Design a protein with these regions (language model features):
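Signature for phosphate-centric chemistry
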Residues: 1-87, 93-268, 274-290
Length: 290
């Protein structure tokens, strides 16, 4: 069971990035201090709306390369599990970056000719409500999880915003007031959050990013914890629906184990949701006040 490989920002996150960068550009001022690199910096894709949501294709951390190399590593470890003459099914949710991840993985594991030689077949599972309780994307088909504003999917964003408000205002003040960048105007929590996001996304594409040097170690620790918060309350132990959705995967795995070797020796499932995949979890609470 795996998510997709490394990707560009989603359209929602990318839109935030571009909006921030356009606002700073429109201010038409020379930036100082930590943000001075923006005077000569360009976004990490020339075709953002084409690349958003898709696998990264360049740099040492390219998603296409990562998926292929994962297939190669699996082959070196688990080739003995392959059954000669038996076609392996690879399940992928209906998202292009997931489908591409599965295809690159298959090329690394089964060889570049995996489709022509019928060594494996890629089965794409739609992310639609008529699929009901499938094991790949239950978060997209559980209505109560989607519609429950207090305890469902959106609770992760609520708790994230609460924690962002504890650590981001000080960063915004440092970048504007202390570093003499007042002319760009106040930075919102989401704008600073977008800056922190761009460190990782640019690193995936270019191998490094000047955004990473903008923030202190403590500020990065807060960002990492904030990422834990959103997943904890959106799809982890802090969400009352997580166990039910994770049970689908657990039940399917249990059924395969009971069936024994006759059911097959290799099973590959790749998924995409806006969260981490819902798996059975042990209760745990982030050690901080939100």
């Amino acid at each position: 069971m795996s998510r997709h490989a490394e990707r560009y920002p989603t359209k929602n996150a990318g839109a935030r990035h571009l909006s921030l960068l356009n606002r700073i550009r429109d201010a038409n001022v020379v930036l100082n201090g930590s943000l001075s690199f923006l005077n000569n910096w360009t976004y990490f894709t020339d075709e953002p709306w084409k690349d958003f949501d898709q696998l990264t294709r360049t740099g040492p951390y390219a998603g296409t390369l990562q998926a292929f190399m994962t297939g190669v590593r699996f082959l070196t470890r688990y080739e003995h599990l392959l059954q000669p003459g038996r076609r392996t099914r690879i399940w992928a949710s209906d998202s292009q970056r997931v489908i591409d991840t599965a295809a690159y993985f298959a090329s690394g594991f089964f060889g570049l000719d995996w489709e022509k030689t019928d060594k494996a077949v890629l089965e794409v599972i739609p992310e639609t409500f008529d699929r009901h309780a499938d094991t790949l994307t239950p978060g997209d088909t559980c209505l109560r999880y989607i519609e429950d504003a207090d305890n469902g999917h959106d609770n992760g964003y609520t708790m994230l915003a609460r924690f962002q408000n504890k650590y981001i205002p000080d960063i915004a003040a440092r970048l504007t007031l202390k570093e003499q960048n007042e002319e760009i105007g106040p930075l919102t929590n989401l704008e600073v959050w977008s800056m922190q996001e761009m460190c990782g996304f640019e690193t995936l594409v270019r191998g490094s990013s000047p955004w990473c040097s903008v923030f202190t170690q403590k500020e990065w620790e807060s960002f990492a914890y904030a990422r834990d918060v959103i997943h904890y309350y959106r799809a982890g132990p802090g969400n009352p629906y997580a166990g039910a959705m994770g049970w689908l995967w657990l039940n399917a795995t249990t059924a395969l184990l009971h069936a024994g070797p006759e059911a097959g020796t290799t099973f590959f499932s790749l998924s995409v949701t806006l969260t981490v995949m819902q798996l059975p979890v042990i209760p745990w609470t982030p050690k901080s006040t939100i």
